[in-house]
Amino acid sequence: MKMIVTGAGRGLGREIVKEAVRRGHEVAAGLRSLDTNMDPLQELKDLASGRLTLLELDVDEEESVLKAKEAMAAKWGALDALVNNAGILLAREQSIEQLEFAAVENTFRTNLLGPMKMVKHFLPLLKNSDNPCILNVSSEAGCFSWAHGRDYPYGLSKAALNFFSAGLRKELSPQGFAVYALHPGWIRTPMGGSEAPGDPADTAQNILDLIEGKIEADAEAWMIDREGKAMPF
C-alpha cells in the first residue's frame, strides 16, 4: 500500500508513519520543513529499505501541496491512502471577548483548508488505486453534541472538517472511495498533553487496521472513533 501522512513530524502522525513502515507499506511522511523534526524519521528511513520518503509538505501553502503531488506522481503514480493528520490548536480557553480572529483564520487554514487542498490535488493519484481511502483526523470537539465555549478556533475548524468529510464521502463513495473523519481519542501528544490517557501508538495501530480493512467501520458511518464505531455529530 502507498500512503501519505501529513503532519508526520511528531505525535500521532509520526506514530502512524512508524506503524505503516513496520507493516511493510510505502509511506511518504509529510513534513513542513525537512530541516526540523527529522531525526526520529531519518533513523526510521535508514531501516525502511527505501519504503519511506521524507516529503517537504506545508499544507498551509497550496504551492507546497502541488510540488509534493508532482513529486509523488513521478515516484508512485498512484496513492492508496491519504491520512490528513496535520493540525494546530490555538487560543484554547479564550472567551469570545478575548479571542483574536487571526487565531481562527490560522486554525482554519491548517485544519480545514489543508485537508481540502490535499484531497483536491492528490485525488488523481487516489483514483489510480483499486481501494482508495481518505482519512481525515478530526475530533469530537467538532461535534455539536460536544460543543462548549472557549474552544472556538479548534472546535469550529473540526466541525467544518467533519462537514467536508461527510460531503466528500457522498461525492466519492460511488467511485469506490472510503472516506472518514476519525476521532483519535485523547492521546499523549504535543497537542493532547502528557496527562492524556491514550497511547498514540495504539491509535496508530487502529488507524492502520481501519485502512487495511482489519477493522470494519460501521457501514453508514462517516464520523468514527478509532474502533470504527459511528460517532454522533
Regions found by a protein language model. Name each.
Residues 174, 181-187, 193-233:
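C-terminal helical subdomain
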Residues 88-108, 127-174:
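Catalytic loop of short-chain dehydrogenase/reductase
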Residues 23-39:
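Conserved glycine-rich Rossmann-like NAD(P)H-binding loop of the short-chain dehydrogenase/reductase
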Residues 9, 13-18:
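N-terminal Rossmann NAD(P)H-binding glycine-rich loop of SDR-like oxidoreductase domains
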Residues 56-67:
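The beta1-alpha1 cofactor-binding region of Rossmann-like NAD(H)/NADP(H)-dependent oxidoreductases
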Residues 5-6, 84-85, 132-139, 178-183:
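Structural signature of the Rossmann-like NAD(P)-dependent dehydrogenase/reductase core
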Residues 83, 118-122, 126, 164-165:
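Hydrophobic positions on the long internal alpha-helix
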